[in-house]
Amino acid sequence: MANHAHILLRSGPAGLSAFMRKLLTGHAVNYNRRHHRHGHLFQNRYKSIVCEEDAYFKQLVRYIHLNPLRAGIASTLPKLDWYRWCGHSCVVGRREHSWYAREYVLRWFGSTEKESARCCRHFV
């Protein structure tokens, strides 16, 4: 997935546009500085969809978590459990990332942490 990323966000009062502008501009400036280049880094504007239904949230989690498998970056589900650039490794408890809201995601899959992690992995 060298040419794109999937990010599932809860938008705040400032809205998604302001956050994405800061994120993408900051990344482009940092990347250009590190690689001694200038100009645009991204080809198009980001794409966003609104998730208003509970069932759709779970489907989005599954779609995003399985993307490294579909792209051939992780060859099996056990390898995906350890893949560092996907939230799946956080949900199953293999890694911790400050950017991943593990507890929020787990709440959708069960009442206890252990049960939720197991159910989420099974769902994926």
Which residues are covered by each model-predicted region?
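Short Pro-Cys-Gly-centered "Cys-loop" motif that presents a nucleophilic cysteine in a tight turn
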Residues: 1-3, 10-124
